[in-house]
Amino acid sequence: AVGRIIPGGDLHEKYCGWLDKVAAFMLSLRTDAGEYVPVLFRPFHEHTGNGFWWGKGNCTAEEYIALWRFTLEYLRDTKGVHNLLYVYSPDIVSSQDNYLEFWPGDAYVDVLGLDAYDRSSWAIETNGLRLMRLLKHIPYLKNKPFAFTETGLENNTSQSKWWTEKLSKAIAGIPVAYVLVWRNKDTNHFFGPYPGCVSEEDFKTFVAGEQILLEKDIAGIYE
């Protein structure tokens, strides 16, 4: 699919039409004062796995890079969208080379990320910490912020200390700009805490730590 939508592909014009809709939406995001709202834009995520049509095994590194670069340049230069921060977020990787295999270039990425979930086969407090330590030097080399762009434990009904004993350990000593846990659909599919859940009090303890800043703790970030 990627080869068909990048420049020269038979579906390239159709892809441009999709991007026109993306651009219209992004440009509609304004404050009451008329200022554009900044957006963390994370296209083609988890590409180191094969679960998506843009993932490894479904396209080459060259095709992926061409897709990323065209997308950014079209939105920025053709459509005038300047309120996006582009986030590069592979899935679990085995090495720094693996992480950078599909790297579109320093000029095409604003934030480096990682998507990794806590599972029975992949413990976040041990495997996650090792992976974070493995990757933490790349943001310094690229002079860009690093974030935990997707994580969580799905439907946590038993681990009351998950935030302080699992997630906190995974990011210990790692200068992550932000952590994003996935959505809460309902009580049968959730990743974040909610009133009455088993980890509610532990989450409050977690966010009270010195490493964590919530929206209420931050002022003037757009100045």
Descriptions of predicted regions:
Residues 31-40, 79-86, 107-111, 141-147, ...:
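Loop/turn elements at helix/coil->beta-strand transitions in domains of secreted/extracellular proteins
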Residues 1-77, 81-83:
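Substrate-binding cleft of extracellular glycoside hydrolase catalytic domains
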Residues 99-125, 182:
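Aromatic- and acid-rich polysaccharide-binding/catalytic face
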Residues 50-53, 95-99, 120-124, 155-160, ...:
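Extracytoplasmic/secreted cell-surface and envelope-processing proteins
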Residues 144-223:
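Substrate-binding cleft of secreted/luminal carbohydrate-active enzymes
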Residues 42-44, 68-97, 144-156, 181-184:
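Aromatic-lined carbohydrate-recognition surfaces of secreted/lumenal glycan-active proteins
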Residues 24, 90-104, 126-138, 161-170:
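Alpha-helical scaffolding within the catalytic cores
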Residues 51-54, 65, 93, 108, ...:
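Chitinase-like catalytic core of GlcNAc-active glycosidases
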